[in-house]
Amino acid sequence: MSRICYLDCFSGVSGDMLLGAFLDAGVEVAALEAGLAALHLDDLILRTKRVEDCGLSAIKVDVDSSRRQNLRTLPDLLRILQESDLSSLVQERAALVFTAIASAEAKVHGTSLEQVHFHEIGALDTIADVVGVVLCLELLQIDQLVCSPLPQPRGFIDCAHGRIPLPAPAVCEILRGVPSYGVALEQELVTPTGAALVKALVGAFGQFPPMQQLAVGYGAGSQRLANGQPNLLRIFVGTPDDVLEEQQVEVIETNLDDWNPESYPYLCERLFEHGALDVSLAPIQMKKGRPGFCLQVIAGREDSAQLKDIVLLETTALGLRFRFEYRRTLPRRELHIESPWGTMRVKEVQRGGRRVIIPEYEECRRVAGEYDLPLQEVYGRIQGLNFYE
């Protein structure tokens, strides 16, 4: 059964907070310990306890790491994963998280991936947090992970390298492209481990996704927040609601008054080739009464940077506006049906519990041309084939 999990990071995110939340949502401690035993790290011992913060019950996770620990490099950690008895999927996901932290630390400290030594990532508690969270996804059979935007604090903290600003430089590197917002707190809210888990494992960011809720879990952090709010992370686990699909998109806009609109079809072609979800051009009246156009491009998070470059290259725009929005779409698929003119490609959407056939313009245009028929007649015949359940 497909399952979805939403991370509600109202007070930030760390590895131990995520791990505690998954345990509170139903992961058995014994099952998690059995999975971590596959790492063959004898000193790794989990300590869990139920705590209360602002009247809310949560699970706090600690790793018994009283023994002196050696600093580890990324190759050391990857070797531990490869020599473990973990499933290949858990190994791959954990490796992505460790590599995300290593890449950020190497960038910040001006060294290579192989040479960077981890003061945090090489410790047993961080290894347990990373591998433990990935194991929890497997144990709960979660295949979709959605996360709220992350809060970013201000101020300074002390670390092994000295006094550094918040957000920590490594966190800033890891969270490139991840939605976030500023808060007035002068305490660390997003740790490098938490940031890397989110960056490597989360598939989408935004509001609470449609789901049939099965469980809620709270994981506790290690500090008390100065503003009095609970230092907790909340997760929701459920089954996806197939009625609506929700995702975060980036809306890119620019106003143009000196651009030749004859180039618009070519621009659309380039934008769609590079992943644009939609492109539109609307007439507007600009300053001094000039007629102009507002070009709007809707993009997925992973394609937005390249699409912005294309707009600046192919138009006379001197700048762009962009913002994050959310969109809901009906579930849809492409299929082939039998028509009076042979097999035709159409769209099928789920609308109000019914399946509805929508004609494809290019297919209808092809048939109209081949059979010398009015385009609207072909459209009407295909729409007449609609069936409802």
UniProtKB/Swiss-Prot annotation:
| RNA-binding listed as a keyword | no
Annotated GO MF terms? lyase activity; nickel cation binding
Superkingdom of the source species? Bacteria
Mention any Pfam family matching this sequence.
Ni_insertion
Any idea which UniProt keywords this protein has?
Nickel
Which family is this sequence assigned to? Belongs to the LarC family.
**Which HAMAP family is this protein grouped with?**
LarC (MF_01074)
Listed name of the protein: Putative nickel insertion protein
